[in-house]
Amino acid sequence: MRRLFVPSLAVALCCSVAYAAPAAGKAPLQHVTIFGDSVAAAFTWDPRARTVLTEGNRVTFDLSPCGRLTEPGCITPPPPSVFKKVELLGRRVGPTVVVLVGYNDDPHIYRAGIDKVLRAMQRRGVEHVLWLTLRAVNKQYLLINQVIHGASARWRGLMTVLDWNSFSRGHAGWFASDGIHLSALGGVQLAIYVHRTLKRMGLNGPVPPPA
């Protein structure tokens, strides 16, 4: 099988960075872990995007240039996959997870691995997974989007698809020349899209008291 591959821009990032610790005496904020590759890098290098996402949430950014879903990344040394990071983090993964990964993946391997990743998250206490579609600038990314939508039908109650591909359509100014990586404006718009969804789903603000 011929592997399809489109390289991502390498962006120097720390593997796991947490923001928005609660003030003393206040109820802790709901914890969100964001897994992404260099496309999601705007969440760390653009303070405006970071401010949007951390409003009302404790956010752990786990972003790796050239990152992949279940295979080591495409640079040397290769960053660990999302699956490997979930295994390493264990219960330190937040109960809410956001995933924006796939630009460096083969669609067939992505299809074989997505259920494995979701099972690993569920075993570690994850209750909600918000999975973003890719900008479908080629057939590879269109196929991965089909995999994402297919998985959501199998994982109702755990996985919610955020259709970034549709939401961003017609907004060329949100992207670099490759149509994938984000401009400063695009990073803010992606952050707003994710944050708005978290609020709508009740996954923003202080941790709710036990029922």
Give the role of each language-model region.
Residues 1-4:
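Positively charged n-region of N-terminal signal peptides that target proteins for export
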Residues 7-18:
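Bacterial N-terminal signal peptides
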Residues 19, 53-55, 125, 155:
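Short, structurally constrained coil/turn elements
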Residues 77-207:
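Alpha-helical cap/lid subdomain in secreted, periplasmic
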Residues 209-211:
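Short, solvent-exposed mixed-charge patches
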